[in-house]
Each structure stands twice: as structure tokens, then as C-alpha cells.
Amino acid sequence: LPAAKFLKEIMLREKIRGSFASGGVTGYLVDMLNEGCFTSLMDVQCFDLKAVESIRTNPAHHEISAMQYASPAAKSAVVDHLDVVLLGATEIDTDFNVNVHTDSAGCIMGGSGGHSDTAAGAKLSMIIAPLFRARLPIITGRVRCISTPGRDVDVVVTQRGVAVNPAKPDLALRLKDAGLPIVDIHELKQIAERITGVPAVPPEGGRVVARVLSRDGEPLDVIRQLTR
């Protein structure tokens, strides 16, 4: 969501107009709609009062249900029409699996929202994250919990470079030709660890307290009770 501010500046400067934006909507996206960056908003959740006022008064700001937004059972889910999605992460591993359910120690932070749905549906899924937070590397050998599988992640963007999923060699070439700093994800991991050191691996935990399923019901991972 914070990326919307910078995306608006680029779209206005380059005269780029999108068909629609979707997801949880904030005032930033409302401003982009009003300034002509998008033709419409497909809103599954208003995140601030500016979005609430817009959905009440602007006929181009459409309310949609969670099923319309992301259900694989829907005939035409909105996520399947996304060209690009920008997503965050608490952890990313070298297989491009992404964790948004827990922190690095395994403590549950919340639900994943439409993270895995949009990553699977969009033509290009981008994970935007700093290389480390609070001296903990974001890129690791294996995420604590797989929220979104690496097969659905195309690009990881950090302040030290852009890693492209090896399954997308054509995309890597196009981004490199565009002058972007393409870096192997293993190299990004090493850069982070040279700055922060290699973190201790937290204990695995006890009984299973949650099961993580993909959008079509496939078991992805489990979350275990923390041991103290």
C-alpha cells in the first residue's frame, strides 16, 4: 500500500493509465483514481475514511465481495485479471517461498489476506521488502512458514538488487535490458548476512496450532506452538 504514493508519481509522469486497481483500498488509491491513473477501483475492503467516502460517492469506485475478489470458485475472480501485484513479506527463502503469517521467530502475526490469491492470479507478482529488519535478514534458506509458494512469485525487489525467479528467464533478461540491477537471490542472502551476521535458527516448536492451505485447498505448511 505505501508503494501507491510512488507509483502515482511514475504513472502521472509517464502518462500510464491502468484499467483498475483492486484489493484493500486507501486514500492513496482514491487519489490515483481521481487523478486518472485508473479507470476504476475494485474494492474488497476500505482501509481509511477517504476510501469510505469515495466508495459512497464515486460510481467508478466499485464494492466487491471477497468471493468476487479472489475465490478460485468464482467464474471471473478479480485477481485473475491483475497484470501486476505488489506484495510484502516477513521472510522470503531462496526458493522464493514467502512468509507473511509469522515473524522470523515463528510468532503468528495475522492472516495473509489475498497474498497467495493475487500472487497466483496476477501476470507478474512482485515481493517488495527490505534486505533486513531489526538486524534480521529477510531472505533465508527456508522460511518459517510458507504462506505463498515460490512457484507463484516472479520477482523479489530489495534496496540491494532485484532477484528474478529462475523459472522466468525471459523476464530476467527484459529487466536486465531495462537497466535494473538483477542479482541472484542467494547473493542477496549473502549480502544481508554480511551486514547482520547469520541469525540463530529458532527452535522448531511443539504441537501444530495452525495449518496453511493454498487457495485451492492444497496443504502448504503448518505453524507450531512456540517453545520457550
Language model regions located:
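Conserved phosphate- and dinucleotide-binding cores of soluble alpha/beta proteins
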Residues: 2-11, 15-18, 28-228
